[in-house]
């Protein structure tokens, strides 16, 4: 009798364990672990880069976690064709001044943001987590590439990621709004910098907030999909000297454009 009770208890425990595994949500790749949300990347992540055997064409081979870089149908960046106009809601920017805290994480230069800044698109609020830079641009518009691209990375309380992309052209005049960043740019020998000065991310946006919208992915491993992209239509300008300051550290950190696979890209009205 005792043996029967023990056996029954064991079977019950096994059944409970199996049921728990069934009802628990399947483990998915958490965007919280992505370097978009952490200045220091996991020591366990597979090494990746932008050239050679660890470059973009090989990312899917570097780790099973990166397989969507090849198999995914909503990868970013893309070449944006500007023919689809749709009455999209305006992006409302609610950015607050924050201390300059910048880091070079081995792949990009990133400004870490404090809580308090956000955007709203329709009824959805996205909190600003950080912004970082690519040189040259990752997105192209009607085949045109730009000198640089800035990504302002946001996330809702529920985990939905939205990135506002700002294209950057080379122009003759310096952009004074960027001087507070350029004064403290990190580099390979000094990967983290801080300043008593503050940066208001609103100041580095174009005045016109019309945008392109599409569904895509992170542009770096693990290239997780499900990212809302808002690419501002009007570029901002930096002088050659200002762009060169960034390129001392991050020249060539752009993923090539990816197939659209039939995705619609909508353009908001001016």
Region locations from a protein language model:
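N-terminal signal peptide c-region/cleavage motif recognized by signal peptidases
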Residues: 15-17
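Alpha-carbonic anhydrase
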Residues: 2-4, 8, 19-270
């Amino acid at each position: 009798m005792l043996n029967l009770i023990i056996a029954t208890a064991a079977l019950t425990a096994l059944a409970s364990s199996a049921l728990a595994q069934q009802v628990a949500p399947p483990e998915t790749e958490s965007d919280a672990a992505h370097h978009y949300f952490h200045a220091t990347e996991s020591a366990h992540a597979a090494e990746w880069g932008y050239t050679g055997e660890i470059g973009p064409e090989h990312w899917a081979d570097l780790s099973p976690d990166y397989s969507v870089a090849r198999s995914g149908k909503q990868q970013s960046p893309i070449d944006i064709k500007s023919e689809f106009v749709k009455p999209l809601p305006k992006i409302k920017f609610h950015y607050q001044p924050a201390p300059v805290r910048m880091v070079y994480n081995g792949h990009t230069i990133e400004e870490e943001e404090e809580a308090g800044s956000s955007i709203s698109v329709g009824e959805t609020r996205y909190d600003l987590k950080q912004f970082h830079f690519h040189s040259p641009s990752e997105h192209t518009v009607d085949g045109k590439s730009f000198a640089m691209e800035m990504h302002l990375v946001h996330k809702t309380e529920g985990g939905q990621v939205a990135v506002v992309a700002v294209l950057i052209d080379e122009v003759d005049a310096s952009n004074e709004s960027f001087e507070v960043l350029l004064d403290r740019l990190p580099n390979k020998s000094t990967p983290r910098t801080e300043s008593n000065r503050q940066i208001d991310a609103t100041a580095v946006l174009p005045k016109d907030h019309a945008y392109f919208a599409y569904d895509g992915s992170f542009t770096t491993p693990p290239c997780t999909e499900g990212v809302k992209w808002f690419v501002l239509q009007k570029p901002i300008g930096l002088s050659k000297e200002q762009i060169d300051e960034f390129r001392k550290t991050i020249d060539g950190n752009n993923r090539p454009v990816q197939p659209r696979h039939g995705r619609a890209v909508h353009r908001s009205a001016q």
